[in-house]
């Protein structure tokens, strides 16, 4: 009696990779095409930016787009951005402003969110309603009174003036409250029985469990204020306090626009944010799924 044994050979990695893109139905095929189209629409501006940063100004808006420039001036463009101007100072200013804002936002938002989520007091629901309503107020509405106050106290062109309007983040309070509400009340009650103060409960119990939410908000906050141009354009009056985003305007004037260096500057400004997101993406995605922000 002969027994035939068939041995299944594992698929090569390349075949498995290609098989993952094989649509199972027409709907899957259409969905895959739409996803590829959406991904390309998101990626193409960065491709354009990187390509333009290596071209001379007259080639940036050539009608025949090609990624690799006919005349390569990428080295000159990036050298001019990094060394002809104190660009490292601009980057340092942006880091100082973003980190300073983030620290104060966390210090103010975490206790406020904990109080709204776990402490029972009269008017808490109404207070939370005001918090949600405050999300609809843009900074443009409050910029004039804040600016006049900074002028009166002589605080223009300082790190404080760049950070002050953003010290309290209503979005952070809302995000952390949604996250804290899911934390078990029984653990908090047990901690109180053991003699924990409310601050100790926040620092030793709540905050370690909220690391994904903190990471997600940190990405939101740092990216938003790193890219901010509106407020620095109002309060910065010297090159010493100029941020990286604001410094890109130096390559544009009424009579001349150095587009090559402008795009090189934009690439240098964008790179740190891409790196931060790549390192924090898992915590970012986890916080979206665990908090109240769901599609």
Feature annotation, model-predicted:
Residues 27-295:
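A structural signal for multi-pass alpha-helical bundles of membrane permease subunits
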């Amino acid at each position: 009696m002969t027994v035939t044994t068939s041995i299944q050979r594992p698929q090569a990695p390349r075949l498995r990779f290609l098989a993952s893109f094989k649509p199972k139905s027409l709907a899957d095929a259409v969905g895959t095409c739409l996803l590829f189209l959406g991904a390309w629409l998101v990626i193409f501006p960065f491709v354009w930016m990187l390509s333009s940063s290596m071209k001379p100004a007259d080639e940036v808006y050539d009608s025949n787009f090609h990624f690799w420039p006919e005349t390569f001036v990428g080295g000159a463009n990036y050298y001019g951005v990094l060394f002809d101007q104190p660009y490292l100072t601009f980057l340092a200013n942006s880091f100082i402003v973003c980190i300073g804002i983030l620290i104060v936002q966390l210090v103010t938002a975490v206790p406020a969110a904990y109080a709204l989520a776990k402490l029972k007091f009269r008017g808490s629901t109404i207070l939370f309603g005001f918090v949600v309503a405050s999300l609809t107020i843009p900074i443009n509405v409050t910029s004039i009174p804040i600016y006049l106050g900074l002028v009166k106290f002589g605080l223009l062109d300082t790190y404080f003036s760049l950070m002050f309007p953003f010290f309290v983040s209503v979005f952070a309070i809302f995000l952390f409250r949604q996250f804290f509400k899911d934390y078990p009340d029984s653990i908090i009650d047990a901690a109180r029985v053991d003699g924990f103060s409310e601050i100790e409960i926040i620092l030793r119990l709540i905050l370690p469990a909220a690391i994904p939410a903190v990471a997600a908000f940190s990405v939101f906050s740092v990216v938003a204020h790193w890219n901010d141009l509106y407020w620095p354009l109002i309060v910065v009056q010297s090159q010493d306090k100029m941020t990286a985003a604001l410094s890109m305007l130096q390559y544009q004037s009424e009579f001349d626009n150095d587009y090559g260096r402008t795009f090189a500057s934009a690439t240098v400004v964008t790179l740190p944010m891409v790196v931060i997101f790549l390192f924090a993406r898992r915590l970012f995605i986890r916080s979206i799924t665990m908090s109240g922000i769901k599609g």
